[in-house]
Amino acid sequence: MAEQTEKPEWWDQAKKELSEADPVMAQIIRANPEGFLATRGNPFETLLRSVIGQQISVKAAANIWERFAKACKEIKPEIITRKHRRTLRTAGLSERKIEYVFDICRFFLENPDAADGFQHRSNEEVIKELCTIKGVGPWTAEMFLIFALRRPDVAPMLDYGFIKAVGQAYFPEIAFEEWSAADRKEEMSSVIAKWGPWRSLNNGPMQY
């Protein structure tokens, strides 16, 4: 898959329909007229970035990735698997994340056609297969669907940034820290129901 720097073919239709269905989204779309969901075009790299970025800040993840990429020279599974663990630890990876990185490498080495194959499979099928890899759970699989495959209908309900952004946009009167899990689930579900098949549009400019 080549890097896709042009907006998805469904993007303009999604913006139009969301603007008509949801006044809050209409305002967000007007405020961000040029943005769109981009992808690096490299599913292997996207999955690695998602795992390396788990449970740390965006800034910390970017710094670790920069050191990791420099240590590996090329982001290819056959190259990364030959690196000594000490090299990856020096780049900032924990022992657990090193295990995850190696397991992702093994998956792509054993399934060389996986990247193209994912394009023709349902969201549920992709999530199920990705979750067989160590370190890949539902959150990481959903990030992959959004940022690698650019699927339009993914609402990452486990993503802190997504939840907080929805809260700030739709429920500004509620302090995020006081938003109970039960209320959050109910209120977010009512918001997301308005988005129809375009739930990925609200995932902001971040790129994995």
Language-model features: locations:
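A short, structure-level motif marking secondary-structure boundaries and short turns
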Residues: 11, 32-34, 50, 69-70, ...
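Intrinsically disordered, low-complexity, charged terminal extensions of DNA damage-control enzymes
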Residues: 1-43, 194
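Short helix-loop boundary/capping segments at the starts of domains
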Residues: 34, 53, 57-61, 70-74
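Catalytic cores of DNA base-excision repair glycosylases
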Residues: 68-208
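A short secondary-structure junction motif
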Residues: 49-64, 90-96, 202
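Intrinsically disordered, compositionally biased low-complexity regions
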Residues: 13, 17, 63-66, 70, ...
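Glycine-/proline-rich flexible loop or hinge segments
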Residues: 43-51, 84-87
